[in-house]
């Protein structure tokens, strides 16, 4: 490596570090979508206080993020800075890894920098705070890339790393990792048969790491007294029942399947073109076969990402895949389809898609449903609590009156601080646990309607028992609902048989107090 190239690489890496961190911090401090924005904040705080997912609170997603956030809170204290820093570091990881990956695959260093810069803009800044789906997609993408490097260079160490990353993805969220793991096993089998002289060592290494990872998890559960049954019900069986229902309910309209993912499909078209060129070649040597495996696996994994995005029903968060696929398109069209017209089209797609989704999702905050918000109305959340200092508060429910929402939150905080009885909070504002220093923990990690089984679901009995045992163990006197939306029907009435024992009092527009101490469990 000559000195000029080395210096250029250092400059690019430094710029990518600054861009990935600064973009994420700016947008991570702008606006909130309470049900998503504060989910991991409270989970990290719970782990910091000695509580664990599956054991102390019902959790259907993202245990890895709980523990990562615990580390950030441990190192940098419980505050919004350490929360956004978590997401910013992950944004930097996918950015710098992409830069490394593109170079290793043969792309010019300057083009590698440009594509990676676009990834840094589109990946985590759309929400800016830790989010299970984004962690899962990022870890899965790195895993797939590492496997492609293993196939490209015929080096087994990449298969080890690929397995580790797919496990990290799985413990961020069950999908897309579960599907990608299966696809990787099939890809490895084909690679072994076609290119590796039927040497099964890559597959053995991959599966060995998967096995050892689960052994490590079991040991961790044993040390922390986390029941395996709870993990299986909460993280495997119940979410699988939701997934099957959502698959059956999928709407196969043009916009759902094609329209909303059009730029992703366009970024894949050059890859499909190269695949067709390679399939038509009469003589297929090891190099061509290897490249075919990499390109076909890229298409398969992209379809998995799109399918998983469709069944999650979130706003679309995978647009950062566009610069990734366009980079791969440039690598292989340059190698096999060297037409001067292709590269300009790829670069135009890159610039248009990056500008479009940066404006829509970062600036206009579409992911948080804040389309049309007035940035002049945002308020510093320091008035709520010093730990939220710098967060520019505005949310969907009070999009034109954030001052009213903050006033209600401050009033609620004051009321809760004056209640010295044992209490839990059921709320999307999941910072109340920390700002009131409440020692009791809600039995739920999350308050989305699908986070717990409905009464018709076969795992409802498991949830009901878990919820009531938690209240009994903690000797809970009061249950507070902090929300505009009435959630007691889902989170209380369904699990309390004798509802007459519950007395409630409406404190303010967002706060309702349920007196639970007279209920016998």
Model-identified regions with their sequence ranges:
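Hydrophobic, aromatic-rich transmembrane alpha-helices
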Residues: 17, 262-291, 326-332
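Membrane-interface transmembrane helices that cradle and orient dolichyl/undecaprenyl
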Residues: 104-106, 141-161, 169, 195-197, ...
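Membrane-interface alpha helices of multi-pass inner-membrane proteins
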Residues: 158-176, 180-185, 299-310
């Amino acid at each position: 490596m000559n000195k000029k190239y080395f210096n250029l690489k250092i400059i690019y890496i430094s710029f990518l570090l600054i861009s990935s961190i600064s973009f994420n911090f700016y947008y991570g401090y702008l606006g909130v979508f309470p049900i998503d924005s504060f989910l991991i904040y409270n989970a990290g705080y719970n782990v910091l206080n000695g509580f664990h997912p599956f054991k102390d609170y019902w959790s259907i997603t993202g245990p890895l993020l709980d523990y990562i956030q615990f580390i950030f809170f441990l190192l940098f204290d419980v505050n919004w800075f350490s929360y956004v820093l978590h997401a910013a570091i992950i944004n930097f990881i996918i950015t710098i890894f992409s830069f490394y990956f593109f170079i290793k695959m043969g792309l010019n260093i300057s083009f590698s920098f440009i594509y990676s810069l676009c990834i840094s803009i589109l990946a985590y800044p759309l929400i800016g705070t830790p989010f299970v789906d984004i962690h899962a997609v990022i870890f899965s993408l790195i895993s797939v890339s590492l496997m492609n490097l293993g196939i490209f260079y015929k080096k087994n160490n990449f298969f080890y790393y690929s397995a580790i990353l797919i496990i990290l993805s799985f413990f961020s969220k069950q999908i897309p990792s579960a599907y990608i793991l299966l696809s990787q096993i099939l890809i490895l089998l084909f690679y072994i048969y076609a290119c590796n002289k039927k040497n099964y060592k890559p597959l053995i290494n991959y599966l060995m790491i998967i096995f050892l990872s689960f052994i490590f998890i079991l040991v961790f559960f044993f040390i922390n007294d986390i029941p395996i049954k709870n993990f299986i019900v909460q993280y495997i069986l119940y979410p699988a029942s939701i997934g099957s229902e959502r698959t059956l309910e999928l709407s196969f309209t043009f916009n759902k399947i094609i329209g909303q993912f059009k730029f992703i499909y366009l970024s894949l078209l050059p890859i499909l073109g190269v695949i067709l060129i390679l399939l038509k070649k009469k003589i297929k040597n090891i190099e061509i076969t290897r490249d075919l495996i990499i390109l076909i696996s890229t298409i398969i994994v992209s379809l998995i990402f799109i399918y998983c995005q469709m069944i999650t029903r979130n706003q679309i968060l995978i647009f950062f895949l566009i610069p990734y696929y366009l980079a791969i398109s440039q690598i292989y069209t340059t190698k096999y389809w060297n037409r001067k017209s292709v590269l300009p089209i790829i670069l135009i797609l890159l610039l248009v898609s990056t500008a479009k989704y940066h404006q829509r999702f970062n600036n206009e905050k579409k992911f948080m449903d804040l389309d049309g918000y007035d940035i002049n109305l945002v308020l510093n959340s320091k008035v709520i609590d010093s730990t939220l200092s710098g967060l520019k508060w505005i949310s969907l429910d009070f999009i034109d009156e954030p001052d009213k929402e903050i006033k209600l939150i401050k009033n609620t905080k004051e009321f809760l601080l004056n209640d010295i009885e044992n209490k839990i909070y059921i709320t999307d504002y999941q910072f109340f646990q920390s700002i009131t220093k409440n020692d009791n923990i809600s039995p739920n990690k999350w308050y989305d309607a699908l986070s717990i089984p409905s009464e018709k679901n076969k795992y409802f009995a498991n949830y009901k028992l878990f919820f009531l045992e938690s209240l009994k163990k903690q000797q809970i006197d009061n249950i507070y609902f902090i929300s505009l939306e009435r959630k007691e029907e889902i989170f209380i009435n369904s699990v309390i048989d004798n509802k007459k024992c519950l007395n409630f009092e409406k404190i303010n527009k967002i706060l309702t107090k349920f007196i639970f101490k007279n209920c016998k469990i």
